[in-house]
C-alpha cells in the first residue's frame, strides 16, 4: 500500500511549526481566510506543494470581506505558485473562475454541509456536478450526526474509483472517516499542524495521523 497522503492545514503564520511537520505531510492547505494578509509572504517559504483556499463563511470559513474580494485574493495564489486552487461548487461565476485557474493550476471543487450528511444519492449528484464543472479533484465534506454518516462519505469515494476524491465527515462523530479517507482510495486527508490549530471540527494532527498510518502498514 502506498503511503497515505496528508495535507496540513495552515491557519496562522507560525513558520517554524509549518516547516516542522513537512516530513509528515505531502502538501499544505493555505487557509487565506484564517491566516490573514500575511499568507502571501508565507507561501514563498513552504517546503511542499500547496492548495490555496479562501473559504466562504457559509461553508465554514472566516473571510470577512465581500465575495468579489474573496475570489480576487484566492486567485492571487496563481501568481504565487499554488499547485491547486480550492473553489466552492456554490461560487457564482464558477465557470469563469475555473477557466482562469486551469491555465496555471489544478482545480479542487469543494462542497461542505455544515449541518448534516446527505444521502449517498445526493452526494453522488453533487460529485457529478463537480466533475461536470471540470474538477480535477472533488471534495465533498459533511457533518456527522451519527456513526453511519462515516460510511456514506467513504462509500462516495468507492463509487468514483477513476476520479480524485476527498470525502469525509466533520465533527467528533466523523473522526473515523478522516482516518480512513485515504485508506479507501481518497486522494488525501486534511490534518492540523498542531493541537489547537484545527481548521475544522474533528481535525486530527498530522503527527497522530502519520502514527496511525505507520501502524496500518506494519
Predicted region positions:
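Glycine-enriched alpha-helix->loop->beta-strand junction motifs that scaffold or abut catalytic
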Residues: 24-27, 47-49, 79-83, 100-109, ...
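C-terminal alpha-helical cap/extension of soluble enzyme domains
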Residues: 158-218
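Catalytic beta/alpha-barrel core
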Residues: 9-11, 27-37, 74-76, 80-94, ...
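Conserved N-terminal beta1-alpha1 strand-loop-helix module at the mouth
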Residues: 1-71, 79
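Anionic-ligand binding region
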Residues: 122-130
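Short, charged, surface-exposed secondary-structure boundary motifs
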Residues: 60-63, 117-122, 198-204
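Active-site-adjacent beta->alpha loops and helix N-cap segments on the catalytic face
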Residues: 33-48, 89-104, 118-122, 145-158, ...
Amino acid at each position: 500500500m502506498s503511503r497515505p497522503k496528508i495535507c496540513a492545514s495552515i491557519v496562522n503564520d507560525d513558520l517554524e511549526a509549518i516547516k516542522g511537520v513537512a516530513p509528515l505531510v505531502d502538501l499544505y492547505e493555505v487557509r487565506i481566510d484564517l491566516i490573514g494578509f500575511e499568507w502571501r509572504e508565507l507561501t514563498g517559504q513552504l517546503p511542499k506543494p500547496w492548495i490555496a483556499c479562501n473559504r466562504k463563511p457559509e461553508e465554514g470559513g472566516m473571510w470577512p470581506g465581500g465575495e468579489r474580494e474573496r475570489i480576487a485574493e484566492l486567485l492571487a495564489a496563481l501568481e504565487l505558485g499554488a499547485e491547486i486552487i480550492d473553489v466552492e461548487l456554490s461560487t457564482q461565476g464558477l465557470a469563469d473562475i475555473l477557466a482562469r485557474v486551469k491555465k496555471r493550476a489544478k482545480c479542487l471543487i469543494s462542497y461542505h454541509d455544515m449541518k448534516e450528511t446527505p444521502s449517498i444519492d445526493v452526494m453522488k449528484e453533487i460529485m457529478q456536478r463537480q466533475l461536470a464543472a471540470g474538477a480535477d479533484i472533488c471534495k465533498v465534506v459533511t457533518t456527522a450526526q451519527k456513526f453511519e454518516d462515516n460510511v456514506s462519505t467513504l462509500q462516495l469515494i468507492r463509487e468514483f474509483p477513476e476520479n480524485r476524491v476527498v470525502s469525509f465527515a466533520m465533527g467528533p462523530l466523523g473522526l473515523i472517516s478522516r482516518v480512513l479517507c485515504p485508506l479507501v482510495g481518497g486522494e488525501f486527508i486534511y490534518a492540523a499542524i498542531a493541537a489547537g490549530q484545527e481548521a475544522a471540527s474533528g481535525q486530527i494532527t498530522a503527527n497522530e495521523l502519520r502514527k496511525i498510518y505507520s501502524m496500518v502498514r506494519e
